[in-house]
Amino acid sequence: MLDIKQIRENPQLIQERLNSRNGTYDIQPILQLDKQQRELEATRSQIQARSNEIGKIVGQKIKSGINPQDPEIQALRDEGNAIKAQLSELEPREKELKAEIEQLILALPNLPSDSTPIGKGEEENVEVRLWGDEYLPQNPNIIPHWEIGEKLGILNFERAVKVAQSRFVNLIGAGAALERALINFMLKMQTAAGYIEVSPPLLVNTDSLTGTGQLPKFAEESFKCADDELWLIPTAEVPVTNLYRGEILAAENLPIYHCAYTPCFRREAGSYGRDMRGLIRLHQFNKVELVKVVHPSTSFDELEKLVGNAEAILQALKLPYRVINLCTGDLGFGATKTYDLEVWLPSSGKYREISSCSNCFDFQARRADIRFKEAGKKGTQFVHTLNGSGLAVGRTMAAILENYQQPDGTILIPEVLQPFLGREVL
């Protein structure tokens, strides 16, 4: 959530930075309502001051011995009653204006950082580095992961459609075991890196989704329970970040690192016709998420470390990947800066996103009201929050099924996963 004071004091800069994003955002309605609200507040303050003054005068006169029924006192009381009636009309309108302003600000995305490249879309993202050329598969006849998975009997999409609908999958036998091995391996790596594991609720309330920025803008992307004010989580970022909603943390307890494995649920309303086959874009998928709550002075350094934690998984699995600095036009709603990790999928000859690591600055902290206090100092500040996948499990499995695919149709198991699976080949 953007700061109304920042919008008010730097309207041109704010509008320019919003214009660099993909979308149309206009801060003028906010400025107009803010002007009305502040004028109303000033009027109310003046009237309230007069009401306080009248109360003081009446009290002094009665204390000095003047009869409470004296015409002068009665006139002051009449004026005071009229002011109270006026205030009772002004206060609801002021609250209404504040609520309107808040709703408009909630619809605005975060401001891109100075180190985020300017661009209109993904074609203008900037490649930061490539890793793993020596691990590019030499098999010239690699087939897509969904085909090899079905041939091996470890993936079944047809029966998942029968049970649910399209964009679901059944993992069977060694497929389910491989997924479980990946989850355990990822959690082991991240807890060793200092993250504290959390097993959070998979259903969250509206305030939680608003706090991390999914609501109100992306309601159509989420699954909502029909009879309850609860939503299935699109990512563990939501429940884990909201652990601290409405709290004031001690500065000495920062940074806070959490990792969480959860199923994630997304309607994929805007992706009709894309990635209809395979594990890339599902309504339900598993992911290990990394979340950081940090001091504002360290958040960009923490982002680099977060990316390194996600990269460590890919490097341990020896999966070729690249790191991309997303441009302003491709930046997520709540992020000020994002690095995407894209893994190599040889069947399509493309790198595909497997992790998105973002610094959200104080955007989520303002929405969720997460603050911290320095010992011995007055006042509080908003924390900075970061999140990233460490990693998306289904996409990691897809990358293994393709990059480790052998000419005879078998799949070698990455060495680091063999202790979890008790086998070397699928």
Swiss-Prot record:
L-serine binds at T235, A236, E237, E289, S389. It is found in: Cytoplasm. Its main location: cytoplasm. One of its GO terms (biological process) is selenocysteine biosynthetic process. The keyword Phosphoprotein does not apply. GO terms for molecular function: ATP binding; serine-tRNA ligase activity. InterPro entries: aa-tRNA-synt_IIb (IPR002314), aa-tRNA-synth_II (IPR006195), aa-tRNA-synth_II/BPL/LPL (IPR045864), Ser-tRNA-ligase_type_1 (IPR002317), Ser-tRNA-synth_1_N (IPR015866), SerRS_1_N_sf (IPR042103), SerRS_core (IPR033729), tRNA-bd_arm (IPR010978). Pfam families: Seryl_tRNA_N, tRNA-synt_2b. It catalyses: tRNA(Ser) + L-serine + ATP = L-seryl-tRNA(Ser) + AMP + diphosphate + H(+); tRNA(Sec) + L-serine + ATP = L-seryl-tRNA(Sec) + AMP + diphosphate + H(+). Gene3D superfamilies: Bira Bifunctional Protein, Domain 2, Serine-tRNA synthetase, tRNA binding domain. GO terms for cellular component: cytoplasm. Pathway: Aminoacyl-tRNA biosynthesis; selenocysteinyl-tRNA(Sec) biosynthesis; L-seryl-tRNA(Sec) from L-serine and tRNA(Sec): step 1/1. PANTHER family: SERINE--TRNA LIGASE, SERYL-TRNA SYNTHETASE. Homodimer. The tRNA molecule binds across the dimer. Belongs to the class-II aminoacyl-tRNA synthetase family. Type-1 seryl-tRNA synthetase subfamily. Consists of two distinct domains, a catalytic core and a N-terminal extension that is involved in tRNA binding. Catalyzes the attachment of serine to tRNA(Ser). Is also able to aminoacylate tRNA(Sec) with serine, to form the misacylated tRNA L-seryl-tRNA(Sec), which will be further converted into selenocysteinyl-tRNA(Sec). HAMAP family: Ser_tRNA_synth_type1. NCBIfam families: serS. This is Serine--tRNA ligase. It comes from Nostoc sp. (strain PCC 7120 / SAG 25.82 / UTEX 2576). The gene is serS.
